[in-house]
UniProtKB/Swiss-Prot annotation:
SMART domains: G3P_acyltransf. NCBIfam families: glycerol-3-phosphate 1-O-acyltransferase PlsY (TIGR00023). This is Glycerol-3-phosphate acyltransferase. Catalyzes the transfer of an acyl group from acyl-phosphate (acyl-PO(4)) to glycerol-3-phosphate (G3P) to form lysophosphatidic acid (LPA). This enzyme utilizes acyl-phosphate as fatty acyl donor, but not acyl-CoA or acyl-ACP. InterPro entries: G3P_acylTferase_PlsY. Pfam families: G3P_acyltransf. Pathway: Lipid metabolism; phospholipid metabolism. Keywords: Cell inner membrane, Cell membrane, Lipid biosynthesis, Lipid metabolism, Membrane, Phospholipid biosynthesis, Phospholipid metabolism, Transferase, Transmembrane, Transmembrane helix. It is a multi-pass membrane protein. It comes from Synechocystis sp. (strain ATCC 27184 / PCC 6803 / Kazusa). GO terms for molecular function: acyl-phosphate glycerol-3-phosphate acyltransferase activity. The chain crosses the membrane at residues 4-24, 56-76, 87-107, 130-150, 153-173, 174-191.
Length: 222
């Protein structure tokens, strides 16, 4: 039992550190030599990378951030499907999945490498959803894309998707740990967007493709 608990703690630490890899921050440093937290919306997420560094960089950051969530859940499944580590109780699998999912999401938004700052955890949460249930992920993504099609406001689309994911999870009758993740991650994404909510209510939230203040010259950046 002690060995199993230590293994679980190690998994939580590993997935937190995985989530903490500051993809958007590194992109800013490598491409323009800037701290992206000082530009645009100050976030290290893909939306601010798009506005600050351009589309190719944003696509790369988005893909890597999604892969963080995918790999966190995949790591748990790999341990349960193999015999290369001490066996963990089968009853723990879904709850351990919940644990690593929360850890990787927190790592993305509260990176130890950035003094506990970071992105808003939307992309990493989506990566987790793809591993929990493909229909859950596709339904949530469809909600996001529908809202962004009509409003062109990324933050509003993320907030609506964070609410909708709970209804989709309930409709799919997912296990309690998965329902817990959709609720906790959904609430967390909304909280992370609190300043965006203020701007939405004031009618000042920038739309996709609009310029924002404090965006550096991208001349020469692909």
């Amino acid at each position: 039992m002690t060995t199993a608990l230590l293994l679980c703690l190690c998994l939580l630490l590993i997935t937190y550190l995985m989530g903490s890899i500051p993809t958007g921050y590194l992109a800013g440093k490598l491409l323009l030599g800037i701290d992206i937290r000082e530009h645009g919306s100050k976030s290290t997420g893909a939306t601010n990378v798009f506005r600050t560094l351009g589309k190719p960089a944003a696509i790369a950051v988005l893909a890597i951030d999604i892969s963080k969530g995918v790999m966190a859940v995949a790591l748990v499944r790999a341990i349960y499907s193999g015999d290369w580590l001490p066996a963990l109780p089968a009853a723990w699998q879904n709850w351990l999945t919940l644990g690593v999912a929360i850890a990787v999401v927190l790592g993305h938004s509260k990176s130890i490498f950035l003094k506990f700052s970071g992105g808003k955890s939307v992309a990493t949460s989506l990566g987790v959803l793809f591993m929990l249930n493909i229909w859950l992920a596709l339904g949530t993504l469809a909600t996001f894309l529908t809202v962004i099609f009509f409003t062109r406001i990324v933050s509003l689309s993320s907030i609506v998707a964070a609410i909708a994911v709970n209804g989709i999870a309930l409709a799919l009758q997912l296990p309690p740990p998965y329902l817990a993740f959709t609720f906790l991650a959904g609430m967390y994404v909304i909280v992370r967007h609190r300043t965006n909510i203020e701007r939405i209510l004031q009618g000042t939230e920038p739309k996709l493709g609009e310029k924002v203040s404090s965006v550096p010259d991208r001349k020469g950046v692909a």
